[in-house]
């Protein structure tokens, strides 16, 4: 019965599929909002109305893309599908909690959409800084609904994190050490630890904001002895690990894709890759104030946060060069997932370089809240996280469905998307260097050219999104079934066949000669 299968499912594959479908749907909503933003900015003058409406759209775009697209797809979708298969577990450690983790997301999404629909909407930016988010500048229920939405999404992620940590540590076969698990499993494990440690701090911050708004507390109100900068510290102590949460599972997927399409049986520098991810996870917690260089931190604090931020480039560089070394000497198979992986490596590196620029507190004073920052984080998210999702989706699509995507169209789709996102975000570096500020719906005429170019790029990206929907439809319509897969000895998830049976590995695994086989 469909209702019992999809509503009450405790099967990691079904829940993973639910996450993927939900994330894809939310991604379309987020994409629609981004196109509204670029339509508004395509020429000087107003399109949508006042800046409140514009900022509500910007805020909703950010929340949807982060909490309802990237995280559900990467952690909920790929994580649920692949982690149990890769470690040879029959399912997740807590299958019913897994179900609850998913079903907290649709109500959370509904609350976020409601927040945009009632009163004037939450036009605070995704950071929700007071006093703008206080009950004077944002009277009404909008910000409160946003806070409740974040609470639900946060609970969902914390439960999911507990589940992934328990699963990866406890549900491996006895013969498999933690250092024999695939890199994607490591990336999800580290991501889960980051979620578990950072989300409670966000919950504390937004709960204090909630009481400031409704119960007359003054945590963030100087009139009662509070400090709005405290909120920024609490938010960014979550917010910076969050951006690593968004990219780490992508690192794991890229490692698998690069290894597979280079014809290698393992990635270059496995232990280096693991330690690099652990270093990134740790360092991600001690650099948060680089988002706050303009709030009058003292010079020693600025010097520390500048240096600590730059240190993150080292483990990141280890990963980039290990991916390149994995390809070295291999027989490269130029399939679509490999194109996405190569695009990821190049564009993520570009985004990382602009990040090094922004890490300098002196430069950041001038660049903070300009389009240079927007360009930076869209290079690592819109071209990092999203490219990893696309590559992973195409690579594992046969595993999920038993069908293969149309290879030529998948490559054309990559080309269109690559052109679109670069045309959208590269010019934004120029706008930022010319001091165009973020979060404004209009701008002086001098900025017209690059804004128009950027908006044309967003339309090309839209064409790519529509192409992807068509390519997926085509695969299900044509029903090209998978015939054979190589490298199953080191790619454990493929061992069950394509598509994977509903229940896998009810018997335990034993390890013989580095090959996992059914006992």
Swiss-Prot record:
Q: Which residues are Mg(2+)-binding? A: 368-369
Domain of life where this protein originates: Eukaryota
TM ranges? 12-40, 51-86, 95-117, 141-170, 183-212, 228-261, 270-286, 299-327, 336-357, 371-400, 407-433, 447-478
For the protein in the UniProt heading, the enzyme class is translocase
Location in the cell = Mitochondrion inner membrane
Name the major location.
mitochondrion
Catalyses which reaction(s): 4 Fe(II)-[cytochrome c] + O2 + 8 H(+)(in) = 4 Fe(III)-[cytochrome c] + 2 H2O + 4 H(+)(out)
What Gene Ontology cellular-component terms does the record carry?
Answer: mitochondrial inner membrane; respiratory chain complex IV
| InterPro entries the record matches | Cyt_c_oxase-like_su1_dom, Cyt_c_oxase-like_su1_sf, Cyt_C_Oxase_1, Cyt_c_Oxase_su1_BS, Cyt_c_oxase_su1_dom
> Which Pfam families does the record cross-reference, listed alphabetically?
COX1 (PF00115)
PROSITE patterns annotated for this entry?
A: COX1 (PS50855), COX1_CUB (PS00077)
Q: How is it placed in the membrane, per its record?
A: Multi-pass membrane protein
Give the Mitochondrial matrix membrane side ranges. Answer: 1-11, 87-94, 171-182, 262-269, 328-335, 401-406, 479-519
Q: Where is this cross-link: 1'-histidyl-3'-tyrosine (His-Tyr)?
A: 240-244
Q: Which residues bind O2?
A: 244
Listed GO MF terms: cytochrome-c oxidase activity; heme binding; metal ion binding
Task: Give ranges for the Mitochondrial intermembrane compartment.
Answer: 41-50, 118-140, 213-227, 287-298, 358-370, 434-446
Give the pathway annotation. Answer: Energy metabolism; oxidative phosphorylation
Residues bound to Fe(II)-heme a are 61, 378
Q: Where does Na(+) bind?
A: 40, 45, 441
**What's noted on cofactor binding?**
Binds 2 heme A groups non-covalently per subunit. Binds a copper B center.
Q: Among its keywords, does the record have Heme?
A: yes
PANTHER family assigned? CYTOCHROME C OXIDASE SUBUNIT 1
Chain's role: Component of the cytochrome c oxidase, the last enzyme in the mitochondrial electron transport chain which drives oxidative phosphorylation. The respiratory chain contains 3 multisubunit complexes succinate dehydrogenase (complex II, CII), ubiquinol-cytochrome c oxidoreductase (cytochrome b-c1 complex, complex III, CIII) and cytochrome c oxidase (complex IV, CIV), that cooperate to transfer electrons derived from NADH and succinate to molecular oxygen, creating an electrochemical gradient over the inner membrane that drives transmembrane transport and the ATP synthase.
Task: Give the family per the record.
Answer: Belongs to the heme-copper respiratory oxidase family.
Q: What is this protein called?
A: Cytochrome c oxidase subunit 1
């Amino acid at each position: 019965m469909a209702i019992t299968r999809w509503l009450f499912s405790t099967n990691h594959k079904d829940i993973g599929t639910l996450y993927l479908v939900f994330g894809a749907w939310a991604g379309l909503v987020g994409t629609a909002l981004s196109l509204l933003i670029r339509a508004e900015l395509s020429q000087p003058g107003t399109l949508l109305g006042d800046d409140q409406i514009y900022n509500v759209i910007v805020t909703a775009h950010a929340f949807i893309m982060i909490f309802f697209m990237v995280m559900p797809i990467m952690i909920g979708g790929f994580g649920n599908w692949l982690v149990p298969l890769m470690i040879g577990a029959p399912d997740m450690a807590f299958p019913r909690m897994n179900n609850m983790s998913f079903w907290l997301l649709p109500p959370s999404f509904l609350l976020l959409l409601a927040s945009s629909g009632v009163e004037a909407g939450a036009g605070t930016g995704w950071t929700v800084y007071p006093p703008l988010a206080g009950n004077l500048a944002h009277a009404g229920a909008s910000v409160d609904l946003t806070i409740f939405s974040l609470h639900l999404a946060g609970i969902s992620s914390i439960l999911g994190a507990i589940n992934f940590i328990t699963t990866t540590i406890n549900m491996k076969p006895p013969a498999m050490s933690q250092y024999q698990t695939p890199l994607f499993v490591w990336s999800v494990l580290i991501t889960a630890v980051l979620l578990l440690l950072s989300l409670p701090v966000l919950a504390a911050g937004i709960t204090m904001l909630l009481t400031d708004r409704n119960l007359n507390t003054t945590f963030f109100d100087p009139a009662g002895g509070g400090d709005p900068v405290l909120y920024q510290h609490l938010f960014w102590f979550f917010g910076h690990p969050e951006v690593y949460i968004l990219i780490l599972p992508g690192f794991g997927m890229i490692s698998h894709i690069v290894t597979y399409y280079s014809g290698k049986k393992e990635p270059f520098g496995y232990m280096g890759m693991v330690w690099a991810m652990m270093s990134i996870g740790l360092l991600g917690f001690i650099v948060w104030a680089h988002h706050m260089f303009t709030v009058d931190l003292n010079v020693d604090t600025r010097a520390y946060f500048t240096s600590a931020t730059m240190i993150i480039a080292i483990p990141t560089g280890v990963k980039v060069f290990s991916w390149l070394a994995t390809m070295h000497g291999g027989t490269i198979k130029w399939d679509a997932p490999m194109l996405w992986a190569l695009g990821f490596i190049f564009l993520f590196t570009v985004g990382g370089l602009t990040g090094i620029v922004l890490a300098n507190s002196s430069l950041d004073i001038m660049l903070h809240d300009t389009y240079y920052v927007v360009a930076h984080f869209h290079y690592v998210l819109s071209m990092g996280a999203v490219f990893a999702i696309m590559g992973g989706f195409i690579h594992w699509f046969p595993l999920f469905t038993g069908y293969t995507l149309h290879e030529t169209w998948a490559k054309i789709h990559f080309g269109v998307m690559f052109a679109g996102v670069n045309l959208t975000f590269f010019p934004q570096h120029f706008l930022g260097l010319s001091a165009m500020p973020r979060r404004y719906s209009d701008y002086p005429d001098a900025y017209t050219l690059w804004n128009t170019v950027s908006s044309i790029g967003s339309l090309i990206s839209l064409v790519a999104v529509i192409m992807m929907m068509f390519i997926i439809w085509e695969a299900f319509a044509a029903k090209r079934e998978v015939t054979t897969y190589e490298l199953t000895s080191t790619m454990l998830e493929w061992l069950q066949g394509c598509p994977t049976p509903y229940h896998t590995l009810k018997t335990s695994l034993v390890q013989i000669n580095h090959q996992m086989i059914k006992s």
